[in-house]
Amino acid sequence: MTIFEELKARGLIFQTTDEEALVKAFEEGPVSFYTGYDPTADSLHLGHLVAILTSRRLQLAGHKPYALVGGATGLIGDPSFKDAERSLQTKETVEGWVEKIQGQLSRFLDFENGDNKAVMVNNYDWFGSVSFIDFLRDVGKYFTVNYMMSKESVKKRIETGISYTEFAYQIMQGYDFYELNAKYGVTLQIGGSDQWGNMTAGTELLRRKADKSGHVITVPLITDSTGKKFGKSEGNAVWLDATKTTPYEMYQFWLNVMDDDAVRFLKIFTFLSLEEIEEIGKEFDQARHQRLAQKVLAREVVTLVHGKEAYEQAVHITEQLFAGNLKALSARDLKVALNGVPTYEISADENLNIVELLVNAKISPSKRQAREDVQNGAIYINGERVQDLDYTLSDTDKIDNEITVIRRGKKKNFVLTY
């Protein structure tokens, strides 16, 4: 199976320019290709992972990746299928984000070894020195307004309004392709399916300005089986930065993927062979309640993004929480697992009984409710039920002398720190 056939089999090809010419280019030898990442935040997220891992697959097949971080285009903002104008960021902010994103990309692509080692580029290196007049003369003249207006990403914004800044974005991305072709011989661009208009602006510029052919592959924007945009948890992006989305949170995200999506996501997000995935799928279908596909998916992706140790910690936390065995976890583990849970700080020598504690920490709304909660068995300290109204916290309730977890009911957790 060729690399192009494998990408198709994994569901990683949404659209291409001339497929026959593209297949021939892959057959004739190593292809230099690039994928662009605009710094719109200080971290990439799961939505970016499809293109990143596709780049890695191509590198493993012998092709040469260029990872372009948009230090210049990030200052402008891509309008593609956005309902409103992006907020412009300062140059200093974008520079900081560029640096962080470059660090993240180095986890997935090999920048050190072999003739096809990856190369990191920043489009500010060429846009930073070009004058407005030169850009209009040397690039702008190759694009008609009619051509630019025909892009679906622009059409969707015409009625609500689009600034010239964002309107010109497609020319900037097109010039990236031209520049990388001229400097490094890059002939293929890979990106999300929402980028088709911007990417083909690059092939158009190559054709008209340099009389050369370029290729484009778009990867699909991933949705779950209900059509919901993939990569968000509770409405928030699942980030690749462990300080923004912990490995435990990422593990839980994959573990909770719907049954109908799990095997498909194994093809897209893991490096297991298609034969292995087929076998996992068969076993999974025989006992879906055991969630084998989700467990394998969580293992493979968390290990890939954060490493084996982080994966093992996530599994350990999950198992102990499920068993209600909170005292088997360290304070560090609990802080990871309960990230975002309401926290109440008390003095280490504060001797509040359970009723006062529940009210002061706003766990129960009143002393009357607090008494009822305790008497009804709704209060748990570190996973153990407390029904004594005179119960007072002791040192044995302080995990690592740092933290106590109080649960009200089945799901409402609260953290006490000292």
Curated annotation (Swiss-Prot):
It is found in: Cytoplasm. Transmembrane segments: none annotated. It is an enzyme of class 6 (ligase). It holds the Pfam family tRNA-synt_1b. Its EC number is 6.1.1.1. ATP binds at residue 232. One of its GO terms (cellular component) is cytosol. One of its GO terms (biological process) is tyrosyl-tRNA aminoacylation. L-tyrosine binds at residues 34, 169, 173. It catalyses: tRNA(Tyr) + L-tyrosine + ATP = L-tyrosyl-tRNA(Tyr) + AMP + diphosphate + H(+). Catalyzes the attachment of tyrosine to tRNA(Tyr) in a two-step reaction: tyrosine is first activated by ATP to form Tyr-AMP and then transferred to the acceptor end of tRNA(Tyr). Belongs to the class-I aminoacyl-tRNA synthetase family. TyrS type 1 subfamily. This is Tyrosine--tRNA ligase 1. It comes from Streptococcus thermophilus (strain ATCC BAA-250 / LMG 18311). The gene is tyrS1.
